[in-house]
């Protein structure tokens, strides 16, 4: 773990005298070259740790149903109070996550608030701020590939930066959640020619296929009692993992009408960290993070043949409005009030089940993607029944293909089934009359790029690749040959490339020489497939 005095430098391709940076608050003559320090890493130990899942329970089969897409308009109330948030405890189902802290002094009842300012502190004019720039193809920094090559059928299923940017979380087909710290080369004051392969600092093993996973919304590596990860897997309860030790800290259990354990298909913490929203078949269950166990609020999304049917596959909260959006495998998107779950609108337009939702930082726009659907759709909360515009991407399988927005809301990044990563500048996309084209596209590897995640403070793009490979039938041979002597299926044509990769997307020209083709350490030359 690095101290706060150590500074983060640009990658080896950008020497200090050429390191790009956004225009600082001061004049060019007053520009300070000190960079913003990186938060300390999550994992406390250098050696990977392993945590196993001791819980196994019954399974409840859930069938996918489709419902009518009917716009609903219901007013909702703003949540008046926010419940406290999860204190770190043993697996006794009595743990809780802490609520958001403020710097305001405590006041007695009726005491005036004179002299107490809620305005943000002014930014030092000497501070340097990194911004994303896609004027050229991002440059490969480092990655992890050996970790996922122990099993031939293994592949990555997405990646997510921690809210504070200190580490990144991955999911894979071997039912293991892995946490990686930022590459140590980024902390060095010397120019780095070669980045070593990334190694996970923590491994958290689930008992079966992982449906969804997410970071605690108030996570900060400087406060260990907020460093938690939630995950849901088949035939298991929802687990809360300690991101410093990899230990299981708490469990949330949902039961059906037969009192059988049922698994959540999607997870999302509320912005204040006080609640955990979980998607089930035609139902959203809301758990209080201060009270693990089976007690929860059940919010039905489909009743009396009306509403949003199907499995709730993804959930996202608006950053500025007291509402959340739910995507369903029934090909619909529902908007609901945060406080009581009352329906606000039901949107339809996708050709397949919804797999990912993402709100714009301004809170007015949100984006949706679906499986076996070649479009990303943009919606406006001010006109929920009207589709603003769409972006084209290749999604030909049922795999969940993630997309992400940078913190400023200017760039949208998505992978596709062929592996191509596309970047769109959506800052000027205000009309649905024109087709928005990507500003840059590149090919990280020759396999499906299913996960993309943009760092919250640094111009770092993380990509995850891989997909399930199905055997291809071989030639049957002569009719006289015995059937048992013939190989019926073959994987000889499959060449999966399962990797976690980090890319530098900083502004300014890149003076470094091109990276050669992939060597024994797994570094790969970026193949640009188009740029506008």
Curated annotation (Swiss-Prot):
Cellular component aspect of the GO annotation: Cajal body; chromosome, telomeric region; cytosol; site of double-strand break; telomerase holoenzyme complex
GO terms (BP aspect): Cajal body organization; DNA repair; positive regulation of DNA repair; positive regulation of double-strand break repair; positive regulation of double-strand break repair via homologous recombination; positive regulation of double-strand break repair via nonhomologous end joining; positive regulation of establishment of protein localization to telomere; positive regulation of telomere maintenance via telomerase
UniProt-listed InterPro entries: SWT21/TCAB1_mRNA_Telomere, WD40/YVTN_repeat-like_dom_sf, WD40_repeat_dom_sf, WD40_rpt
UniProt-annotated location(s): Nucleus, Cajal body; Chromosome, Telomere; Chromosome
SUPFAM superfamilies: WD40 repeat-like (SSF50978)
Annotated region (Disordered), positions in chain: 1-53, 80-122, 510-532
Quaternary context: Component of the telomerase holoenzyme complex composed of one molecule of TERT, one molecule of WRAP53/TCAB1, two molecules of H/ACA ribonucleoprotein complex subunits DKC1, NOP10, NHP2 and GAR1, and a telomerase RNA template component (TERC). The telomerase holoenzyme complex is associated with TEP1, SMG6/EST1A and POT1. Interacts with the chaperonin-containing T-complex (TRiC) complex; which mediates the folding of WRAP53/TCAB1. Interacts with COIL. Interacts with SMN1. Interacts with RNF8. Interacts with histone H2AX.
Protein name as it appears in the record: Telomerase Cajal body protein 1
Organism: Mus musculus
Gene coding for it: Wrap53
